[in-house]
Amino acid sequence: MGWNPVMNFAPLPLRSTLDLYKRQAQELLDAHRSGDSRAIQILHEHHPRFLDTKIPWLPKNMPESEIRSAALELDDARLAIARCYDFKDWAALEEHVQGVFRDDSPVLRFESAVEAVIAGDVAALKSSLHANPELLRARSTRVTHFDPPVHRATLLHYVAANGVEGYHQKTPRNAVEIAKTLLEAGAEVDALADMYGGHYATLPMLVSSCHPAKAGVQVALVDTLVDFGAAVEARGSAKWSSPLMTALAFGYRDAAEALVRRGARVDSIAAAAGLGRLVDAARMLTTADPLSRHRALALAAQHGHLDIVRLLLDAGEDPNRYNPDGNHAHSTPLHQAVWAGHGAVAQLLVERGARLDIQDTIYRGTPLGWAEYGGRTDIATYLRAHGARTTAELEE
């Protein structure tokens, strides 16, 4: 197959003309019609026709041949391209392009500052803030396909690299300097944006993001935000409003410990379980409510705290319940222990009655399927020795 631009699809620069986006759409359509596998992947991941109706970010479980044979028109390709940039539709992308091409546009000023934030360009950011100090309170006006459609992120939210459009979720090595530049200039440290169906400050978004963790700056950013007054306790009632419980839920133990060091309270059995504090967990056990105990087992298994898992099982917690909402509720404690590579915890759960045939509710994988997909060879061998099968094997 000859070279096709879609195979090298990448986001266009900020001030790209609408014609360039149209060209991307035409290339996508042409590549789909020629059977290009990259084009099929883009359509599968971004066109609503090929996404799950209940879990709108999840591609349907369908063969590539079905997408290849689908009758698609230019409007379909344009919609998919708009969704690659996380816009709601082509009209929203077109409105954005019009905004960034007006020299006096607040959209251009804000989006240019976003580019400086995610690129780690301190000089450009300072220049933008000096010329337009209102940027410190400005909000994104993008119309996305998220819940809710307009996330209203501030520039500081972009430092967290979470809850905003995917191609802007980047963490430069000097993210701490970027954050300090914004905060020293007067950015509101706990401003709320509309993300994931709730209202969130930067801190909980930071401690649930893989990008600052992979860049090695997540803990330093926690300290920076707290230095400037960020609340370490929950603000509001959204699912992930507690920075500590959010960090634990997403597996960022170092960030969780940093929050405790900076004053976050360990005042629930779930928090104690996630942090591996056996004495505290045992002390809280008798007075903990059922949901807290349920959450505690989920977190203890996810983080590999064997003694706390045993404590909770001895107290009657059921290893076969799906985890509670906000703690990978599509999976069981065994799924999470397997995925994180906690072999001893997985073995204990199996010994205490954890079923091997329960499928997660998103990917329909059994614990063995998770082990094999995640490269947990020793755990997979153990599970197979105890009769485990993958979903495909169970359906044979």
Q: Which residues are covered by each model-predicted region?
A:
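Ankyrin repeat boundary signal
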Residues: 137-139, 191-193, 234-236, 268, ...
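Ankyrin repeat A-helix N-terminal signature
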Residues: 115-120, 149-150, 158-175, 202-218, ...
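Intrinsically disordered, low-complexity eukaryotic regions enriched in glycine, serine
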Residues: 2-127, 131, 169
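Start-of-repeat signature of ankyrin repeats
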Residues: 152, 196-199, 239-240, 293, ...
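Ankyrin-repeat-protein effector appendages
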Residues: 101-113, 253-275, 279, 283-292, ...
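Conserved ankyrin/ankyrin-like repeat signature
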Residues: 124, 178, 221, 254-255, ...
